């Protein structure tokens, strides 16, 4: 436990250890320290802007190849700044045709190979467009979870997940509720998924403890006081958002930045959103928990692009649409149930399809969370979950709520 534990109260198993690869990379002193790729689509021309930072001055040769290996753009840069390359008649990336170009950055001492997707995400008249086409997020929330390896996820398991999602017509994933391993985004670029990248911030537990004697109304009204609206937490909250955005800025599957989950709203999230929009104005921002704040105070929502909700009734959705709200409406979570699925699926789907300002939703959630505990007499795997390890405090079967079993067998 540490002070960071207050910001990591996601609904999942609690496990200890190092879950992802850790490595040391030795590089020459004369090297690229960072690069930031931005793209501009103008009719039949794409401009690729690559902002570079160096440890020491050096010459960089830049080339872009199409998927057949043909060079479509060349450039160079000899000092920190931005190189601009142009691609004529570009192939645009989308979820049905996730076309990727190869980027090669060559210096005297090393070669860096990355990929680029050409796509444009924007909001016009409360409707979200990808490459000028109205889109619907047919999304799902995905946790890192394996019945044998826990939070450690292999490329093979992720490939299984993404393949199953494609087979069942999902086109979007929310990284609930923390940034995933870097290869997750590379695979989403390749497979064609739009991603909501979410910061590792969730703090609904502390407010339940500090306000446990309050009425539900007062708890939600003052939820934000301890963390979201206390400047003591500004550095921690903004830092987590910055680390996510800085690390993942060159992954084009990411169309939306999420400030976190279920942590209420206040001055610290205002700062995080302000930094994010200044750094990356081309992507959309969302934060469902922005609606939980001190009702006696006024807050800045100008850097939030989407009005997002969890589990609203159909009547609430219709009320927002009738009032002609100023932002697109997104269901970041819906259709949550343990055991058999909940009803009203068709009604929600129909409402999403019938209203351009309702840009889609993300089903909660992808997989059941459980730990493999050997084999039963009938040959089936025994899966243990809340309470099966003798713990006094647990959530029962609350995390057995996925569309697939822990081993990814479809329900």
Where is each model-derived feature located?
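Hydrophobic faces of well-ordered beta-strands that scaffold small-molecule active sites
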Residues: 138-140, 173-175, 195-197, 255, ...
């Amino acid at each position: 436990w540490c002070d960071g534990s207050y910001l990591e109260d996601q609904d999942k198993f609690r496990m200890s250890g190092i879950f992802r690869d850790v490595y040391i990379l030795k590089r020459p002193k004369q090297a690229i320290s960072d690069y930031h790729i931005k793209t501009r689509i103008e009719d039949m021309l794409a401009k690729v802007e690559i902002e570079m930072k160096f440890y020491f001055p050096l010459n960089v040769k830049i080339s872009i190849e199409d998927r057949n290996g043909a060079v479509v753009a060349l450039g160079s840069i000899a000092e920190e700044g931005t190189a601009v390359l142009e691609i004529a008649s570009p192939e645009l990336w989308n979820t049905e045709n996730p076309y990727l170009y190869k980027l090669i950055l060559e210096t005297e001492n090393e070669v860096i190979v990355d990929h680029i997707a050409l796509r444009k995400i924007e909001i016009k008249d409360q409707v979200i467009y990808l490459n000028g086409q109205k889109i619907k997020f047919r999304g799902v929330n995905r946790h890192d979870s394996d019945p044998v390896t826990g939070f450690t996820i292999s490329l093979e398991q992720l490939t299984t997940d993404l393949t199953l999602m494609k087979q069942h017509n999902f086109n979007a994933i929310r990284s609930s509720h923390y940034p995933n391993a870097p290869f997750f985004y590379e695979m989403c670029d390749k497979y064609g998924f739009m991603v909501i990248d979410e910061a590792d911030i969730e703090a609904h537990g502390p407010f339940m403890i500090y306000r446990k004697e309050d009425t539900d109304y007062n708890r939600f009204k003052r939820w934000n006081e301890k963390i979201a609206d206390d400047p003591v937490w500004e550095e921690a909250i903004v830092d987590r958002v910055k680390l996510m955005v800085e690390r993942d800025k060159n992954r084009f599957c990411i169309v939306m930045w999420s400030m976190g989950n279920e942590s209420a709203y206040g001055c610290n999230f205002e700062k995080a959103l302000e930094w994010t929009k200044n750094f990356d104005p081309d992507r959309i921002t969302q934060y469902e928990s922005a609606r939980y704040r001190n009702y006696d105070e006024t807050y800045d929502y100008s850097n939030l692009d989407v009005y997002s909700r969890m589990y609203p009734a159909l009547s609430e959705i219709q009320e927002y649409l009738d009032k002609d709200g100023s932002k697109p409406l997104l269901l970041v979570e819906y259709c949550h149930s343990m055991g058999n699925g909940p009803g009203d699926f068709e009604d929600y789907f129909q409402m999403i399809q019938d209203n351009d300002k309702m840009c889609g939703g993300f089903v909660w959630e992808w997989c059941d969370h459980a730990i493999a505990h050997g084999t039963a007499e009938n040959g089936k795997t025994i899966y243990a979950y809340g309470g099966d390890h003798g713990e006094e405090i647990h959530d029962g079967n609350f995390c057995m709520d996925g569309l697939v079993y822990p081993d990814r067998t479809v329900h």
